[in-house]
Amino acid sequence: LWPPLVPTMVLVESLHGDAGRDANTNRFLKTCIIESTVSVDVARRAAELRRLARTGSAVDALVVAIAEPGGTVLTGDRADIEALAGHADRVTVEVI
């Protein structure tokens, strides 16, 4: 689980664009591996997961697809991530 891999698209959903409000998140991100590319295959898999789960944002679906196979997703949004992970290959969900 450590260090966490964080796709860059997650930054858009987790940051506010304000240094003061983002300070704690930025401290956490310094401990992470930031993944800046998503392959076409992973993007297609994310689209498939969204179709199968019938819920979740594109970013959530990409996070779950990147975690395949056998990864763990850390989230504060259990419902959508678990719905997507239910169709993924051995992806577990931990709520933080």
Per-region residue spans from a language model:
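Flexible glycine-rich beta->alpha loop in the catalytic core of nucleotide-sugar glycosyltransferases
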Residues: 79
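PIN-domain endoribonuclease scaffold, especially VapC-family toxins
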Residues: 1-71, 82-96
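Acidic beta-strand-to-loop metal/phosphate-binding motif
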Residues: 73-76
